[in-house]
Amino acid sequence: MAIAKIIVDVPLMQTDQPYSYRIPEEFEGMLEVGMRVHVPFGKGNRLIQGIVLGLESQSEREEMEQDLKDIAEVLDFSPVLTQEQLWLAEELRKSVFSYKISILKAMLPGFLNSSYDKILYPMAGLSQEDRDRLFGSEDSLAFSSLDLAKQAEMMRLTRKGLLGLEYQAIDQKKVKIQSWYEVNLAQLEGVEISARAKKKLELRDYLLSHPESASLASLLEFYSREQVNFFVEQGAVTIVQKEVQRSAAYFEGIEASQPLELNPEQRQARDAVVSAIGSHQPPFLLQGITGSGKTEVYLQIIQGALDKGKTAILLVPEISLTPQMTERFIARFGEKVAILHSGLSNGEKYDEWRKVERGDAQVVVGARSAIFAPLKNLGVMIIDEEHEATYKQDSNPRYHAREVAILRAQYNQAALVLGSATPSLESRARAGKGVYQHLRLTQRANPLARIPEVQVIDFRDYIGQNETSNFTPPLLEAIQDRLAKKEQVVLMLNRRGYSSFVMCRECGTVDTCPNCDISLTLHMDTKTMNCHYCGFSKDIPQVCPNCKSCSIRYYGTGTQKAYDELAELFPEARILRMDVDTTRKKGSHQALLDQFGRGEADILLGTQMIAKGLDFPNVTLVGVLNADTALNLPDFRSSERTFQLLTQVAGRAGRAEKAGQVLIQSYNPQHYAIRFAKDQDYEGFYAYEMGIRRQLGYPPYYFTIGITLSHKKEEEVVKRAYEVMNILRSGLSETSNILGPTPKPIARTHNLYHYQILIKYRLEDELGPTLNQVLALTQERENSELRLSIDHEPQQFL
């Protein structure tokens, strides 16, 4: 008897193991490791999804002793998880403190985690006899409507290419199917047509001169269905169903590009990485100043991998925010590229996943989760802007794409490149110790482009001069100068909306979210106050909710308010605003950048999304309206993030022949992060910040574990937090430093109170067993409403 080892989709400590199920006779020899099934589970035999982890045979006596249940349904016609992904899940389980089923599900595309059916339809090669027997008068059949024997037969025919398969989800995530025609020239030449049937004669002549397969719709634009059916009945034309790629629009209008001539530093970097493919060398840190041509190096490294018969993954932070990067890779590699990111429609996501699964795509460009793309013969992975916090998933399973890439490189003997102008301190420290190979690009790729001049403007020098303005006189003068020269300006303000908060001047009440400990943000375009955490929204108050005073004032600033001020100061200027609110609609981000790139706007105002990867030769002025926004956040990485952001945004200026200028406004111009950013001095910042990290005992000198507890009742979360503290103190060695428990800086969101504990350690043998004890706390019945998360190397502390 055939047995399958299946892990079920019940993310609990007690069920984090494979269970044995009997494989029905109809599916013996067809079920494979990595396929999904429905199985009865628990006393009530509730049908739930599971993943096959192994197959084995058992004697009839052993099976009777175990009293195994049968698999109820096979969900896939082929494995949706590879052997590599199954190995990867087991390795990640050791560091992300998550259940194996949660890690496996993170590797699957979203549509496979939804409720759907499989729709089967006949392909051209299926005999008429089998078509009539299986489908009768129907054009297609739902897989779920068939008995087990018929399902097994359909699976065999699908594997032979005689049936087509369409995933049809409840929310219509499915294959896009079109009718195409195929011409049988031998039959067509023998068709007899009356001389009076001029349209049929015309259609025959067209088909004789255009015998290649094409969409039926293209014929029906000029000929009636009756005229086409005449040739179908004669056997001269066959109508077939074909899967159509919705992502085809990505490749339209993008001209093919050729490799650029590299400078000596770029060539050295490319050659070092390409030679490492297949030899399992340590990862590379490619540290290149802004404008040094890292992207062209990436392109040529990937070409080197393709030349060796290998595949490649490029990760980009928030890929929907960097359409220029996507276009460059499509221009170089064409339809070998698959795009995987959250900005795609559900249908597009499915199409791209299918391209990768079938081997039609050899290059994957995507955001964080694209690191799990099931590419075969993986040769190189590149993580662009490797310092970005978005590479760490902040929900379960809390993996870091960099650590996943290191494991995949180990499995495939692939090269791994971490690229950045401002590497994370952890990566730079590893390069300093020789754990990573350090490659540097110290000059701009365009020899005529110069590093822009950076000037810091002290806001305090202009106190008393229109204190409500976002703009100091030097910045206004610089904007006016660039507008007069017909050059473009980029302005960054890391806060969206109109004002930070609304306050009553009589009693000091600030309008806050009823679900979260956070002030509401004013949005004048919708005339609402919004919470950017839980989405709560209300109308702008006319009177104070506390004292009923009408003395309401708007404090702080935002991109919308800055936009209004710019429009008033420079009425002749064409201004574009780019933030989360103006780029919600699909394609709107691309449209705004295209508009700016065509010179249809003079000023681009936005949040930090404009700091990354934009390359416009006519941009000669970059202004940062307030460099202090992130400096004072309660996070030990706040200085590092401020330095990185300022350096990145400064790199948008002077990328071609025209000289660039950067103006940074700050209330704290002497802060070391701002001083080093002004001088574009990464190594100086690195040395200074490392001294602080060593003194305070933070990464990269120590590892960190963040534990967050959440509950509707504050007294309950405090009580459980101290229980966790007791477990940690009794389980961990004295060399580990345990901080907390304390309320999180934003202590309440979504009607839940949040407390956190931080563990700092270097070597801790008892870490795993102790944290498993902490996780066991959540399995107790009285803690059913407690939420507890364990985060290895947390990136955010708010």
Where would I find each of the regions flagged by the language model?
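Short, flexible, solvent-exposed loop/turn segments with mixed acidic/basic and small polar residues
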Residues: 9, 131-134, 694-699, 744-750
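Arginine-glycine-biased low-complexity disordered regions
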Residues: 710, 714-720, 732, 741-766
